[in-house]
């Protein structure tokens, strides 16, 4: 199986969350079908055609785009689906941009997996992060996605403004009830060019220590995996954009954040097993 990534930086996202700098990075760029086609072509020479291959739209809230632009971006992917080069499509979006009409459009273009940027299910935390939606939007979106038969992934965060460890634990309990197929876990970092950078500089926000971020992420990881929910990533990708000089202002950065989280999870599991 090969996942062919297609990046549409910040496309379709109407809000500037306090921790996000994508508007600063990508400006007002608009994705096009030609952009998608060029990105796909970079990978096609390296993969064997087959139904297990998947095109994946990353970096924006895809269903927040106008329907005609979504259709345009799907055009190169539709061709690969028709030719049998790939078998499905996945994408990420906001929970408040899920409705029946949008999901019918996704189904018409081979989308089988939808990831929701949830971050937290605590309305106070969502408001502090200026997410622009509430927890009820997540519950409605997951319910509708299940009705339409999509595989569902949820993206979660620890260390957000106004987010205590108890808040994280409460979010996890709600996630277990929602029952997604998989999840990602990210520690919040203070990134250059974000509103959170200014909040941090004013002394109004204190990020988690690395130790605390590992502890909280390991808790989330353990709860999810023990419930049969696969955690497909822990920590941000340590790429050039993130790790460039001065880009990380503060916060619990580790280039392989998943490793100490996995170790903490395994150590706790072994301790419980021998009690």
Model segments located where?
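Canonical Radical SAM [4Fe-4S] cluster-binding loop centered on the CxxxCxxC motif
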Residues: 1-35
């Amino acid at each position: 199986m090969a996942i062919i990534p297609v990046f549409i930086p910040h496309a379709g996202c109407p809000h500037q969350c306090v921790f996000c700098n994508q508007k600063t990075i990508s400006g007002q760029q608009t994705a096009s079908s030609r952009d998608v086609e060029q990105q796909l072509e970079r990978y096609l020479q390296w993969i064997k055609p087959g139904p297990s291959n998947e095109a994946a739209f990353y970096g924006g809230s895809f269903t927040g785009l106008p329907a005609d632009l979504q259709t345009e971006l799907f055009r190169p992917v539709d061709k690969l689906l028709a030719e049998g080069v790939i078998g499905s499509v996945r994408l990420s979006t906001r929970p408040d941009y899920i409705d029946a009409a949008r999901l019918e459009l996704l189904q018409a273009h081979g989308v089988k997996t939808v990831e929701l940027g949830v971050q937290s299910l605590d309305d106070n935390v969502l408001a502090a992060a200026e997410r622009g939606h509430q927890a009820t939007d997540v519950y409605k979106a997951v319910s509708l996605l299940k009705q339409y038969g999509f595989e569902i992934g949820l993206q979660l965060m620890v260390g957000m403004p106004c987010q205590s460890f108890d808040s994280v634990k409460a979010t996890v309990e709600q996630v277990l009830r929602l029952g997604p197929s998989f999840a990602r876990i990210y520690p919040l970092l203070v990134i250059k060019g974000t509103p959170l950078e200014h909040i941090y500089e004013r002394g109004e926000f204190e990020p988690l220590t690395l130790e605390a971020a590992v502890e909280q992420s390991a808790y989330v990881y353990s709860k999810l995996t023990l419930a049969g929910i696969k955690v497909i990533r822990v920590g941000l990708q340590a790429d050039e954009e993130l790790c460039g000089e001065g880009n990380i202002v503060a916060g619990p950065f580790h280039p392989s954040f998943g490793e100490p989280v996995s170790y903490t999870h395994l150590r706790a599991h072994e301790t419980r097993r021998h009690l």
